[in-house]
């Protein structure tokens, strides 16, 4: 296919371009890679010992792996939107609860009681599980389902670049934000959880069992995107032999 990056800028591919940017962006501002990169530091901050912090990091990794496997089993039954929405709400609630516990219990010198420290660990595992069966795998699956062949290479390239770019940005800024916001960092990521869940609810159509060649119809029938892409079915018919 010739000039995929030029084609993806065309009006009829505007929804795919938006999703190629928005989905990986939201995937990273969930804060999941912060947990992956800095979990031992985070767990030591709330009062767990060094060994317990490392073990807790392994535990969150196992939870993420299991929940991703669960996603593989249920995604075709419940659909992409349902998992996006449920996972987003699960992450939002757990982040708010973690932030609330830390605001209430974390003193100026750091550390909380053992009971609350393990409560935070459980809540973070719930958060990781929410990501693992929703935004984790679906952040890669859905973009692969919405790009037609003529823009697939461009769309997937944009998706990967945006993902890695915001992985880098979030990872580089997290420690500074943690020092500045303290427990408020969880409310910060929770706020993005609200935004991305509303975005999916309003703007992402269901892609389950939709062939790639039929995706243009999905956009044309969507309440918002039909105003953006217009009706190019006539043009398609004129081009047909």
Could you tell me what each predicted segment is?
Residues 1-241:
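Alpha-helical transmembrane bundle of multi-pass membrane proteins
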């Amino acid at each position: 296919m010739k000039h995929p990056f030029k084609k993806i800028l065309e009006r009829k591919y505007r929804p795919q371009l938006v999703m190629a940017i928005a989905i990986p962006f939201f995937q990273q501002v969930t804060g999941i890679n912060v947990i992956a990169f800095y979990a031992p530091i985070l767990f030591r901050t709330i009062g767990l010992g060094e060994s317990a912090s490392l073990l807790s990091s392994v535990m969150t990794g196992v939870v993420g792996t299991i929940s991703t496997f669960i996603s593989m089993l249920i995604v075709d039954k419940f659909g992409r939107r349902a998992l996006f929405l449920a996972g987003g709400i699960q992450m939002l609630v757990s982040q708010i609860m973690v932030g609330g516990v830390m605001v209430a219990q974390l003193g100026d010198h750091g550390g909380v009681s053992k009971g609350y420290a393990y409560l935070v660990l459980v809540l973070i595992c719930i958060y990781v599980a929410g990501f693992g069966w929703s935004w984790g795998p679906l952040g890669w699956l859905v973009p692969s389902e919405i790009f037609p062949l003529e823009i697939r290479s461009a769309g997937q390239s944009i998706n990967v670049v945006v993902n890695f770019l915001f992985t880098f940005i979030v990872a580089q800024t997290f420690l500074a934000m943690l020092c500045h916001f303290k427990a408020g960092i969880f409310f910060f990521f929770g706020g993005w959880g609200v935004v991305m869940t509303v975005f999916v609810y309003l703007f992402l159509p269901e892609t389950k069992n939709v062939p790639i060649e039929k995706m243009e119809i999905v956009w044309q029938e969507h309440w918002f995107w039909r105003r953006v892409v217009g009706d190019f079915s006539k043009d398609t018919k004129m081009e047909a032999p």
